[in-house]
Amino acid sequence: MRINLFESDLERVARTLTDQFGVQVICQGDEAWTDGQRIVLPSLPEPMDDRLERMIVGYLDHEMAHVAFSDFKVVKEFSGKHPGHEAMLNVVEDALIEKRAMQRWPGVRANLDAMFAQIRDRVKGLA
């Protein structure tokens, strides 16, 4: 039952994003990313706890911020001119788009904080 409620909420947010930004939200694979036309989130495991739900919503907020604030043309041009340096640009861009998202949508900060805490805990578990 819990996963169905979360999936329902996620679908509602996805519909809002589609209406507002014209993007599609799908869950597949094990990474979160966007190309500006669609947002891909990791597949949803069962069962999910509250921390994992917040992490998925944090991913959605982060990728939504890319859709709202990234200039994909500039990113593509940079990648063409500076192959191998895309990760450096992405780090700077992530900080900028997340700051703008937190200013525009106040609830985003809590979701990003939860996402980073979950990622940090998973990385610590690998050490």
Please report, for each region that a protein language model flagged, where it lies by residue:
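Basic/hydrophobic alpha-helical interface regions
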Residues: M1-A127
